[in-house]
Amino acid sequence: MAIHKILTLGDPLLREKSQPVRKITSNVWKLLDNLADTMYDAPGVGLAAPQIGVLKRVIVVDVGEGLTELINPEVIAASGEEVGAEGCLSIPGAQGEVPRAAVVTVRGLDRHGRVREIRAEGLYARALQHEIDHLDGILFIDKVVRWLENQPGER
């Protein structure tokens, strides 16, 4: 387990689309561990593999209710809309209001290859959507409807 440098705005890897994990190996377990260590050290509530330079569809989230690890996550259902404040470990100092689905169902694999289906709302739903966006090269600044702090250089 290790703490990695978090890539910041302007690094082209943050805009790349991540590849699905085809086989869960010890390297994927190590990636999950490193993501969690890096997220907690930052500290943050979520981190996606591209943020540490790995273009794989892997995320971790912990909004205070325990660690969620997901491999190849996808939103399979979404309802309602809430606008809420977001920031990002890859864009230090920037915060903005972002519209997101109020309730989502996310499907992915756990570290043992078992299918997990999570119904989430509130901050948990927001964090899952934010991290899944990272896997497609989408940053929260692409969706901001109102800035709360300093505006970053890229839109």
Curated annotation (Swiss-Prot):
Keywords, in A-Z order: Hydrolase, Iron, Metal-binding, Protein biosynthesis
The protein's Enzyme Commission number: 3.5.1.88
GO BP annotations listed: co-translational protein modification; translation
UniProt cross-references to Pfam families, sorted A to Z: Pep_deformylase (PF01327)
Catalyzed reactions per annotation: N-terminal N-formyl-L-methionyl-[peptide] + H2O = N-terminal L-methionyl-[peptide] + formate
SUPFAM superfamilies, sorted: Peptide deformylase (SSF56420)
InterPro entries linked to this entry: Peptide_deformylase, Peptide_deformylase_sf
Active site (catalytic residues): 131
Cofactor(s) needed by this chain: Fe(2+)
GO molecular function, one term: metal ion binding
Domain of life: Bacteria
Gene3D superfamilies the UniProt entry points to: Peptide deformylase (3.90.45.10)
Binding site for Fe cation: 88, 130, 134
Root EC class: hydrolase
Cofactor: binding details: Binds 1 Fe(2+) ion.
Family of this protein: Belongs to the polypeptide deformylase family.
PANTHER family, per database record: PEPTIDE DEFORMYLASE
Function in brief: Removes the formyl group from the N-terminal Met of newly synthesized proteins. Requires at least a dipeptide for an efficient rate of reaction. N-terminal L-methionine is a prerequisite for activity but the enzyme has broad specificity at other positions.
Protein name per the record: Peptide deformylase
